Every structure is written in C-alpha cells, then in structure tokens.
Curated annotation (Swiss-Prot):
Source organism per UniProt: Saccharolobus solfataricus
Domain notes: The catalytic core consists of fingers, palm and thumb subdomains, but the fingers and thumb subdomains are much smaller than in high-fidelity polymerases; residues from five sequence motifs of the Y-family cluster around an active site cleft that can accommodate DNA and nucleotide substrates with relaxed geometric constraints, with consequently higher rates of misincorporation and low processivity. It lacks the O helices present in high-fidelity DNA polymerases in the fingers domain.
Compartment(s) where it occurs, according to its Swiss-Prot or TrEMBL record: Cytoplasm
Named cofactor requirement(s): Mg(2+)
Predominant location: cytoplasm
Protein name: DNA polymerase IV
EC number(s) per entry: 2.7.7.7
Domain of life: Archaea
Keywords on record: Cytoplasm, DNA damage, DNA repair, DNA replication, DNA-binding, DNA-directed DNA polymerase, Magnesium, Metal-binding, Mutator protein, Nucleotidyltransferase, Transferase
Class of the enzyme per the UniProt entry, highest EC level: transferase
Cited PROSITE patterns: UMUC (PS50173)
Length: 354
C-alpha cells in the first residue's frame, strides 16, 4: 500500500493570509469570539509568526492578546474555510484510488493503483499534489508518503510546515525502532506519561513488555493498535469516508415534550443533514437542547450505514429514549448529527459542495 497524507498548513490562518496578503509575515490569530465581551472567546488557530510568540490553539483570546499584543486578531469565517477545503479535497480525489477525509484540513489518499505500486512514483505524485494546490489555491500543505496511514501522518507531522516527508518500505523498521511513544497518533500526553512510567519510551519497548499490563493502561483497542504498529503489522486501509460530521438543528415553535410536535422538525433536520452529504452515514445522533440550554444526545451506529428512510424511525426511537431519560424538562431545539460518512466516490464533488 502507498499512502499519501495531506495536512493543510495552519489552515484557517493561511486562508486569511491568501485573502488578505497584507497579513503575510505578521503574527495572525484566528479567533472564535463568544460575544460576551470584545475579548471573550478562544484561539482557533494561529500562523507560525504568532506561534513563535507563544500563541496556541485553545488559548483564551485575552491571554493571547497579553502575550502577543501586536498580533492581528480576526474572527473565524468557517464557510470560507470550508469552500477552500472543498476545492482542495476535490483536487485530491482526482489523484487517489480512495480518499479518507479526516478533518476539514487533513486527508489520507491511497494511491497504490494510481502509481501502479511504484513507491518512487508515489513520491513524485505527492510533489505534484503540493504544487497543484499551491498554484490553484495559494495554500501550502505538508505531505507524508509511507506504506500505511499512521506512518504517513507521523512523517508529515515531522515535516511541517510546507514539507514532504517520506518513509520508504525499506526504511520502515528502522523508523519504528526509533519512534518515541508520544509521537504516535492517538497517544496523548497523559497516556504517554503512564507508558513512560511502565518503561515504554520508544515504540519498540512495547515488544518487551507484558501485553496484559499494557492492556490495563491503554485499553484493549489501543493496546492492539500499538502492538501491531510495533510489529510492523499495522495495515488499516484507507476508506472512502469522511469523519467530518454533518448536522442540522432547528428551533421548535415552543418548548415542549410532545413527540408529535417535535417529530416534523426532527424529520426536517434529517432531510437537511442528508442533503449535505454524498454518501451514507454509519452513525446517527439525535441531539436535544433543553429549555435550560442543557444538551442531551443519543446515538446509534450501523455497520453498513443507515439510509434516510431508516433514519426517520431510528431518530424517533432515539428521541423517545432521550425523553424517557429526562422526564421533566421540555425541548427547545432538536437536531441530528451524521458521522462516519461512507463516501460515494463516483460523485465526490457533491459531497464537498457547500
């Protein structure tokens, strides 16, 4: 397998730089404002100039302004970023056998057949992709090329920004042997510290530890994931799906618990959510915003996806379960969220259109 992982560099801030060239080279911070005060809210992302000053994603805006008072602060404009993402994802799709959209600014491409199994041709394709995105959208991306998804992401992370990282099949074992445990996707800082305490500093240390002890710390799924990666047996395929959820929420005419009143709005939310996707969701979640603005949710996963016709009945059942769980409060808003979309790749452009 030949996988190309594409990561759009500091995406939201970079789009703002493209649309506002005067921002280029200056500290730029994209913010999500809460609206309570002029400085309330959090940092969504920052360009590298702002990061050098200590600004980080998730940081309160007021703190960012204290450490980087001269930076440019702009509000997040998600529809614009989505439009850029859609165009880039469609471009990527043209170069892939399969495309798995991991987020608004990340995607995995299986290009094995496209390059006829020739790894060096895969590297050349990655270069072509970088250049094409730059020419058409003025956006730099970092790309990783490797024999599997995880390695492609890791080498891309090591190559930021605007880089091209490569792990050839002959280099995989040496790379795995020297890989720090905290560099592995899915291993957060807290879990990494616990693994360090067990004597696991490098991925290779997994092979010399008691598997049952590892499982107690990480859980079954993650222990198996780490073991397969350490043994160089990780082979999860790239799938034609999107991990970007699609949702729709509607305000009821009045606060109520009456299912007959809520259902038409829930059905409308389902219709509008399904209209956003070109494919079949594997998970559906009903979300109820209560009269006191508390949020309740209940979801269900389907191995082979769920059609819109079946979604109506499933959503009604989930709604009734929520109302049984909360027997007192009225519902103010009702919504539905669709996750893990199995993409209809033959018409992928419809999936990404806003």
């Amino acid at each position: 397998m030949i996988v190309i992982f594409v990561d759009f560099d500091y995406f939201f801030a970079q789009v703002e730089e493209v649309l506002n060239p005067q921002y280029k080279g200056k500290p730029l911070v994209v913010c999500v404002y809460s609206g309570r005060t002029k400085t309330s809210g959090a940092v969504a992302t920052a360009n590298y100039e702002a990061r050098k000053l200590g600004v980080k994603a998730g940081m309160p805006i007021i703190k960012a302004m204290q450490i980087a008072p001269s930076a440019i602060y702009v509000p997040m404009r998600k529809p614009i970023y989505e439009a850029f993402s859609n165009r880039i994802m469609n471009l990527l799709n043209k170069h892939a056998d399969k495309i798995e959209v991991a987020s608004i600014d990340e995607a995995y491409l299986d290009v094995t057949n496209k390059v006829e199994g020739n790894f060096e041709n895969g590297i050349e394709l990655a270069r072509k992709i970088k250049q094409e995105i730059l020419e058409k959208e003025k956006i730099t991306v970092t790309v990783g090329v490797a024999p599997n998804k995880i390695l492609a992401k890791i080498i891309a992370d090591k190559s930021k920004p605007n880089g091209l990282g490569v792990i050839r099949p002959t280099e995989v074992q040496d790379f795995l042997n020297e890989l720090d445990i905290d560099e592995i996707p899915g291993i957060g800082s807290v879990l990494a510290r616990r693994l360090n305490e067990l004597g696991i500093q490098k991925l290779r240390d997994i092979l010399s530890k008691n598997y049952n002890e590892l499982e107690k710390i990480t859980g079954k799924a993650k222990a198996l994931y780490l073991l397969k990666l350490a043994q160089n047996k990780y082979s999860e395929p790239v799938e034609n799906k999107s991990k970007i959820p699609h949702g729709r929420y509607l305000t009821l005419p009045y606060n109520t618990r009456d299912v007959k009143v809520i259902l038409p709005y829930l059905k409308k939310a389902i219709n509008e959510a399904y209209n956003k996707v070109n494919g079949i969701p594997m998970r559906i979640t009903v979300i109820a915003i209560m009269e006191d603005l508390d949020i309740l949710s209940k979801g269900k996963k389907f191995k082979h996806g769920i059609s819109i016709d079946n979604a109506y009945k499933v959503a009604e059942d989930l709604l009734r379960e929520l109302l049984v769980r909360d027997k007192r409060r009225n519902v103010r808003r009702i919504g539905v969220k669709l996750d893990n979309i199995i993409i209809n790749k033959t018409n992928l452009s419809d999936f990404f259109d806003i």
